[in-house]
C-alpha cells in the first residue's frame, strides 16, 4: 500500500487474515467466531495529517515511509474522505503563492465529517500576526465561495488562532436515530465514521436488555455514552481531557439527553473514589452510591486497562470492552476471565490494509 494507492482488490484477503488472527488470539478465552464489520474499501478516514514540503516554487503534502523514513509526495489520499481530497488540492492552490500563508508552514491537519463540515489546521515554525490572519480569512472565504464548509486554524508555538471556531458537528444515523457529535480540533475522534456507526449499533444491540445504570471510563466526547443512554436508566461517564468534556456536555444538550452525567477525572482517580479510598471535590453533589451500575463500558488507550482498573471492572456483572489493541485486551482478559466469560466478540475493520485491529467483547459474570 502507498498513500496514493489502496490495494482494494486485496480487501477481502486482509480482512480474512484479521478474523483468523483475532480468533487465534482469543482462543484461550473464547471459542466464539467473531462478528465481522467491514469498512468501506476507500474514503473511510475522516481525519488526516500531512507534512508540507517546499520544493522551489512548488509545495505539496508528504508522508514518510514507515520502514525507510523516505518522504512520499501525496497529491491524493484515497484512504481519506472525498472532502479531505478536495480540500488538499484547494489548500495547496490557496497557500502556494501566498507568502504570509506559506512561509514556515510545515504541516496541515484535516478533520471532516459525514455532514460535510471541515476544520483545517495550519502549523507553523513562526509567529502568527495580523497579516497571517487577514490572508487566512481571505483563503477561508474563497474556499467557502467554492461551496466548502470549512474552518481554518493557525497554530504555532504557544499560539492558536481560530478564525471563527475550532470544532465541527458530526451527524450520525445510529439505529434509527440521528446523533449529533461535536468534534474539536486536536482532540480524539473516531477516524472511520462508517465503522463508528457500526460499533455504536453493535454496542446498542448487545446491551439492549440492560438493567440498572451504565458506567463508562474514558468517554471522550461522549461517543458511546450518549448512543447507549437509551438502553440504561442512567449513565455515569468519566473523561480527563477538558476539550472532550466540554464537547460531551454540548453533545448531551444537542441530543436532548437527560440521563447522562460526565465527570472530569482520570479512570485511576475514579477507581479510588468508587472504592472509598479518596474523596474528590469534583464529585461533590454526585451520589456515587445512588448509581446501580450493572454494566461498565471501557474503551481504553492502546496500553489497555491498568491493574487497579482491571480489579475495579471485575466488580460489575457485565463489562463491555472496545479495544484498539487486541494484544492488551488479551492481557487484560487473563485477569478478567477469572470472573467473567466472553459472551460476544466482534471485529471492526477500523484501519483497512494495516495490521491494526479494533474489536469488541461483552463479558458476563460467571
From Swiss-Prot:
S-adenosyl-L-methionine binds at residues 190, 218, 223, 239, 299. GO terms for cellular component: cytosol. It comes from the Bacteria. One of its GO terms (molecular function) is rRNA binding. Gene3D superfamilies: 2.40.50.1070, Vaccinia Virus protein VP39 (3.40.50.150). Coiled coil: none annotated. One of its GO terms (biological process) is tRNA methylation. Keywords: Methyltransferase, S-adenosyl-L-methionine, Transferase, tRNA processing. It catalyses: uridine(54) in tRNA + S-adenosyl-L-methionine = 5-methyluridine(54) in tRNA + S-adenosyl-L-homocysteine + H(+); uridine(341) in tmRNA + S-adenosyl-L-methionine = 5-methyluridine(341) in tmRNA + S-adenosyl-L-homocysteine + H(+). Signal peptide: none annotated. The keyword tRNA processing applies. PROSITE patterns: SAM_MT_RNA_M5U, TRMA_1, TRMA_2. InterPro entries: MeTrfase_TrmA_AS, MeTrfase_TrmA_CS, SAM-dependent_MTases_sf, TrmA_MeTrfase, U5_MeTrfase_fam. Its EC number is 2.1.1.-, 2.1.1.35. The active site is at 324 (nucleophile), 358 (proton acceptor). SUPFAM superfamilies: S-adenosyl-L-methionine-dependent methyltransferases. CDD domains: AdoMet_MTases. Belongs to the class I-like SAM-binding methyltransferase superfamily. RNA M5U methyltransferase family. TrmA subfamily. Dual-specificity methyltransferase that catalyzes the formation of 5-methyluridine at position 54 (m5U54) in all tRNAs, and that of position 341 (m5U341) in tmRNA (transfer-mRNA). This is tRNA/tmRNA (uracil-C(5))-methyltransferase. It comes from Salmonella newport (strain SL254).
Amino acid at each position: 500500500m502507498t498513500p496514493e494507492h489502496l490495494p482494494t482488490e486485496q480487501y477481502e484477503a486482509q480482512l480474512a487474515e484479521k478474523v483468523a488472527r483475532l480468533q487465534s488470539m482469543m482462543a484461550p478465552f473464547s471459542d466464539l467466531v467473531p462478528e465481522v464489520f467491514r469498512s468501506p474499501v476507500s474514503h473511510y478516514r475522516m481525519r488526516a495529517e500531512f507534512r508540507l514540503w517546499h520544493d522551489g516554487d512548488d509545495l505539496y503534502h508528504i508522508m514518510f515511509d514507515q520502514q525507510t523514513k523516505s518522504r512520499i509526495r501525496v497529491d491524493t489520499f484515497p484512504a481519506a474522505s472525498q472532502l479531505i481530497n478536495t480540500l488538499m488540492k484547494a489548500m495547496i492552490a490557496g497557500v502556494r503563492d501566498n507568502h504570509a500563508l506559506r512561509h514556515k508552514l510545515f504541516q496541515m491537519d484535516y478533520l471532516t465529517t459525514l455532514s460535510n463540515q471541515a476544520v483545517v489546521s495550519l502549523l507553523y515554525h513562526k509567529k502568527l500576526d495580523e497579516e497571517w490572519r487577514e490572508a487566512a480569512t481571505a483563503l477561508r472565504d474563497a474556499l467557502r465561495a467554492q461551496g466548502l464548509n470549512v474552518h481554518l486554524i493557525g497554530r504555532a508555538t504557544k499560539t492558536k488562532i481560530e478564525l471563527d471556531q475550532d470544532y465541527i458537528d458530526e451527524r450520525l444515523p445510529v439505529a434509527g436515530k440521528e446523533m449529533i457529535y461535536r468534534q474539536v480540533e486536536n482532540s480524539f475522534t473516531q477516524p472511520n465514521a462508517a465503522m463508528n456507526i457500526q460499533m455504536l449499533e453493535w454496542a446498542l444491540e448487545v446491551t439492549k436488555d440492560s438493567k440498572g445504570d451504565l458506567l463508562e471510563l474514558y468517554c471522550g466526547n461522549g461517543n458511546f455514552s450518549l448512543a447507549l443512554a437509551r438502553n440504561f436508566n442512567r449513565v455515569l461517564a468519566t473523561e480527563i481531557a477538558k476539550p472532550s468534556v466540554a464537547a460531551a456536555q454540548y453533545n448531551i444538550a444537542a441530543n436532548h439527553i437527560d440521563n447522562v452525567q460526565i465527570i472530569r477525572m482520570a479512570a485511576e482517580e475514579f477507581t479510588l473514589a468508587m472504592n472509598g479510598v479518596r474523596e474528590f471535590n469534583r464529585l461533590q453533589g454526585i451520589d456515587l452510591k445512588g448509581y446501580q451500575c450493572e454494566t461498565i463500558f471501557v474503551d481504553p488507550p492502546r496500553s489497555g486497562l491498568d491493574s487497579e482498573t482491571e480489579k475495579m471492572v471485575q466488580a460489575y456483572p457485565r463489562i463491555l470492552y472496545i479495544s484498539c489493541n487486541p494484544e492488551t485486551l488479551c492481557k487484560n482478559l487473563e485477569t478478567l476471565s477469572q470472573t467473567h466469560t466472553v459472551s460476544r466478540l466482534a471485529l471492526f475493520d477500523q484501519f483497512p490494509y494495516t495490521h491494526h485491529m479494533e474489536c469488541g467483547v461483552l463479558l458476563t459474570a460467571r
